[in-house]
Amino acid sequence: MSNKVKSDIEIASVAEILPVTTIAEHLGLDADALELYGKYKAKLSYDTIHSLKDKEQGKLVLVTAINPTPAGEGKSTVTVGLGDALSKKDKKTVIALREPSLGPTMGIKGGATGGGYAQVIPMEDINLHFTGDFHAITAANNALSAFIDNHMQQGNDLGIDGRRIVWKRVVDLNDRALRKVVVGLGGPIQGVPREDGFDITVASEIMAIICLASDLKDLKKRLSEIVIGYNYKKEPITVGEMGYEGALTLLLKDALKPNLVQTLEHTPAIVHGGPFANIAHGCNSVSATSTALKLGEYVVTEAGFGADLGAEKFLDIKVPALGKAPDCVVIVATIRALKMHGGALKTELSEENVDALAKGFTNLQKHTESIQTFGIPYVVAINKFITDSDAEVAKLEQLCEEHGIPFSLTEVWEKGGDGGLELADKVIAAVESGEEDYKRIYDDAWSIEEKLEAIVTKVYGGIGVELSSKAQKQIVEFKKYGWDRYPICMAKTQYSLSDDPTLLGRPTDFVIHIREFIPKLGAGFVVALTGDVMTMPGLPKKPAALNMDVDENGNAQGLF
């Protein structure tokens, strides 16, 4: 008998999948509430969303993690498995996830719909083109770029300074060659030559806007507030001044609607939006989460990368827009990541190393302290891998007990919802404890410097911030325009609490270096670029795409 471990797509391809209309029935919705995209995917109509507005909200559980290894620590897997486990506990549960980006799917991740026996399906569709949301966002973003270049070509009534355009084109791929380009070459009729560049679609401000807009009216307002660049007087120019917010809203009207799918165990899953947490705010859409809260007793959602990135942004940026804080936070930790933080080489993470695990435990400690700073009860989910030794598991459990950290050994990758029943019990207990006393770590009225200081000292564990001369000048400019009242969205490496990806564990006495700010007024925040973080990733030497294929029957291979 073969002991070969099945791949995610092998598991998903033989799973029983129910019609999405049946999944909707579990939520009390009939077929008329859906806009079908085939048999197993649907969007929730605006009428449906509007009909739920007066319903009581359920309980919200946020899943985050420690600082990850490049392969990720199974946050989506735990989110799905916990949702299935809560369903087994007779809690009416809805999972709210982000949509995967094609860039990392083709690059390093190979997919992002959970893993093993804790997946959302149809995973092939979700990982590739899904319902076309990302394509619509890409089209809207690049339409705006075309409108800008056309305006300059056709007389430039607004006096747009081509040297000071901050709006970039996007593509939903990892393509380092497009980071900096020149457009408008070829003579007078081909446009006005200028420097430009591409970001990945998930870093687009329009992606953030889709994920923070409450409805079509709010979407249009936010689009109008996008700053595309500056005129020759160095004054900001917005989409509203150009007059294209209506056209952009038209392109995005369907992309704003949340998508309904299911898990392998048929728990309803609303999958919508997908900003990265290292270069954007890292949370699925407000529309998806708020709709899920009206449909379920329990909603399990996630925020990208570690608690220093996704969770901080969820709590400081998304919660005010959502109008509800999490009732409990789950922090996903893996033995392999803790060993990495304790000094083990990336090539040796599958080998037993109890000493490295003990040293790396400080990274987990810091993240638990950060969540407590926000006043929210938490549970650590030890996401068990088949390479974890019994001695390592015992040591991590011992360390958690010694430090009073609530935890649960979680085996949802191998066992699905059954592997998360203890975690579900502890989450339910934390939610029902009523201990949630949410507080943001800064107020919007604070200065940019004060907000940065709060994030760095309270969440990262650093001692302060160092601003480049450009960043210092920008702060003066932003105060003049009133932009200093917006929340801060840090663009930072996901691998370290600092802005140095090689500084692992729990570093101390470090400063965060801010090289530049980007106003994202439509999204409603100011991005602070730290270190060398890129808004357009590159591909690894051997992309995951090398292992992807499709057979003669149209079945995908190599998605994992």
Curated annotation (Swiss-Prot):
Instruction: Please give the Pfam families that the UniProt record associates with this protein.
Output: FTHFS
- PROSITE patterns tied to this protein: FTHFS_1, FTHFS_2
The molecular function terms of the Gene Ontology recorded here are:
ATP binding; formate-tetrahydrofolate ligase activity
InterPro entries registered for this protein in UniProt:
Formate_THF_ligase, Formate_THF_ligase_CS, P-loop_NTPase
| Reactions catalysed | (6S)-5,6,7,8-tetrahydrofolate + formate + ATP = (6R)-10-formyltetrahydrofolate + ADP + phosphate
Q: What pathway does the UniProt record associate with this protein?
A: One-carbon metabolism; tetrahydrofolate interconversion
Which family, according to UniProt? Answer: Belongs to the formate--tetrahydrofolate ligase family.
Q: Which HAMAP family match?
A: FTHFS
- Domain of life the protein comes from: Bacteria
Organism, per UniProt? Listeria innocua serovar 6a (strain ATCC BAA-680 / CLIP 11262)
Instruction: Alphabetically list the UniProt keywords.
Output: ATP-binding, Ligase, Nucleotide-binding, One-carbon metabolism
Q: Does the keyword Nucleotide-binding apply?
A: yes
**Protein's name according to its UniProt entry:** Formate--tetrahydrofolate ligase
Q: Which NCBIfam families match?
A: PRK13505.1 (NF010030)
Q: List its EC numbers.
A: 6.3.4.3
What GO terms in the biological process aspect are recorded for it?
A: tetrahydrofolate interconversion
State the CDD domains in the record: FTHFS
Q: Where does the chain bind ATP?
A: 69-76
